[in-house]
From Swiss-Prot:
GO terms for cellular component: cytoplasm. It is found in: Cytoplasm. InterPro entries: EspG (IPR025734). It comes from the Bacteria. The lineage of its organism: Bacteria, Bacillati, Actinomycetota, Actinomycetes, Mycobacteriales. The keyword RNA-binding does not apply. It comes from Mycolicibacterium smegmatis (strain MKD8). DNA conjugation in M.smegmatis is unidirectional with distinct donor and recipient strains; mc(2)155 is a donor strain while MKD8 is a recipient strain. Mutations in a donor strain that alter DNA transfer do not always alter DNA transfer in a recipient strain. Interacts specifically with ESX-1-dependent PE/PPE proteins. Disruption phenotype: Loss of DNA conjugation when disrupted in recipient strain, strain does not secrete EsxB. Keywords: Chaperone, Cytoplasm. The keyword Cytoplasm applies. This is ESX-1 secretion-associated protein EspG1.
Amino acid sequence: MTAPFTAETGDAHIDDVVGVEVTIDGMLVIADKLGLTDFPPSMGIRLNIPQPDLRKVVWEQVERDLSAQGVLDVYGNPHPEVAAMVDTLARADRTLECRWWRRDAGGKMIRFVVCRKGGRHVVAARDNDLLVLQRVAPQIGLAGMVMTVLGEGSPANVEPLTGVADRLAQCRTAEELTGYGIPPTSARAYASIISEPDGWVEIVANERHPGGTTSQVDVAAGVLDAKQGRIVSIPRRVNGELYGSFLSGTKDNLERALEGLVEFLPSKTWFDKTDADNAYQH
């Protein structure tokens, strides 16, 4: 195994490579060469061949495939931009971990993350054994990063709905929802979206501390898509009690949902101040 990858990845980009597509085995080979072992848990990236001899044979073939793909150079070293993206994924300062259940695609689950290390941002998505990593600009905002995977969506025509999370979670019918002071049309739309979504996303946030320990929030933001449109959910804590708010799924409201989620982290922010200053200079 080579020495751990320590190049600074928070500032200027190395070249015009903005994304890479690899298998899980390919990611494990790249990570091994960079001395990286930990990835966001939701991505499920872990050693899958326990026998060292068999793993050596498989990885040798994977290395040949990665070299043909241009991910590894003639010396077997990862492309610098690929190395920087993998390093961001493995050593992120902040992470949004997302699980996207797609009823409209046979019930499959797509896992994806938004990661920040310094001023660098990477979106990584997993579909079965295929991983796609993409570098993104911080200027597009957290909602823009999440929407690189989810797509724009059509915002549902609903009024905001807020209530104590535990009680709101028990509501299933329009009649129950009208008790929260929203118009019957919005209540019917919410009831239909909640009962028959085409897909839904659960999003949690993590923060990495100096020394390598991490904190994860104990609440989640959400996105639901249905034929009536998209809605987003925002967690809030008021006087120690957890509230949930549902809003039409516009990009601005998704940004509010993600910012509200990040406020549950110990730092209460996606950027450290110096990182924010650096990120928006590029």
